[in-house]
Amino acid sequence: MPRKIVEPAVPLAKPVSEIPGGSIAALKRKARGCRACPLWKPATQTVFGTGPANAEIMLIGEQPGLREDIEGEPFVGPAGQMLDRALAEAGLDRGMLFLTNTVKHFKYEQRGTAKLHKRANAAEQAACRMWLAAELARVRPKIVVALGAMAAQTLFGNTFRLTRERGEWRVLGEHAVGMATWHPSAILRGRERKDAMYRQLVADLRSVAQRSQ
């Protein structure tokens, strides 16, 4: 008998067949045993979300990098350092936010001794959707910020285009609003547009801060 598709009471663009329950700590323990896609095999560990379980604001990134894979926490590498600076400039306290990623394992390509970041494919993103849904259902944030195109399309659908719709507020279900902005890692790769993209990130985060007041 096919599994019933349940429309989640969470703001995701696509339905999730099953949403795990429990506290954030319990969800983190459950996620360690996830074998829904092959990314767990080469990864050091699952990188689950972190922050207050009743946070008003949730920031959703794309996928862990090398430092996150080693330390087991989201946004602790170079992109996380840039995010910390942008949050401070925008007047947001990182300790009051719930930070997570769309995908919970580090995907990489081995080049000699180096592990080079590789984007998770659609099937891998879909396999992780239940964990993001569980985080959203448990935290129930009022404001959701997608950092990067992967997170934005997970929230707003595959037709969403970050270059056109960045910084625009959208209604997410009955209880939340959301917006998308640049992922700090994209800014780090931005070269000649780096400064402009960073200013836009800070401006968008200031809009988040104002909305939360």
Where on the chain are the PLM-derived regions?
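A polyanion-binding, active-site-adjacent surface
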Residues: P2-Q213
